[in-house]
Design a protein with these regions (language model features):
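Glycoside hydrolase catalytic-domain groove-lining segments
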Residues: 1-59, 91, 130
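Carbohydrate-binding surfaces of carbohydrate-active enzymes
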Residues: 40-169
Length: 169
């Protein structure tokens, strides 16, 4: 009751059961919305997918990051999510002081290069925005015709993610 919305930070690389296949697999591509929908189901509050990304060149090419962002942004939209925010706007590789120089993994995640030119992921976001604007920003809410009952055990996330992926096939 203290919050209007909840948030998730769904990185496939750090999520159990989501990283068993390539980032661009069905499981990898559905992970963000699956986590957010599970959060909504448990809390009864809308969920914002914030701080999502691919971890940049550490995990994949700029083109794969762009495709991942596009699929997930569309998925967030069609599944009625509150929003979808990429991490982050700018590269941090030119910031040679703490905390930015502590972890090489976190330095090249931006939508813009250090010179502020667009990376392919920024172009994907523009395409998604233009498509949504052209189609109209609202779509019918999906009907829920099944639920996943959680027992509260250590493998709940495995069951949630597996059930969500199966429901989309």
């Amino acid at each position: 009751d203290m919050f209007d919305v909840t948030t998730v930070h769904p990185y496939v690389k750090f999520s159990p059961y989501a990283d068993h296949e390539p980032l661009t697999s069905m499981r990898g591509l559905l992970h963000a919305v699956a986590e957010a929908k599970a959060n909504e189901g448990v809390t009864g509050k809308p969920c914002l997918i914030e701080e999502v990304g691919t971890l940049g060149n550490f995990v994949c090419s700029k083109e794969i990051s762009a495709g991942y962002a596009k699929v997930n942004a569309y998925s967030a939209w069609v599944n009625g999510m509150t929003g979808f925010m990429w991490w982050c706007a700018h590269e941090q590789s030119n910031l040679a002081y703490p905390p930015y120089d502590w972890c090489p993994l976190e330095r090249e995640l931006g939508m813009l290069e250090n010179d502020k030119s667009e990376k392919p992921v920024a172009k994907s976001f523009r395409l998604v925005r233009e498509t949504i604007d052209a189609l109209g920003s609202t779509i019918p809410k999906a009907q829920t015709d099944a639920v996943c009952v959680l027992a509260g055990g250590s493998n709940d996330w495995r069951n949630v993610l597996g059930s969500y992926v199966l429901s989309k096939q």
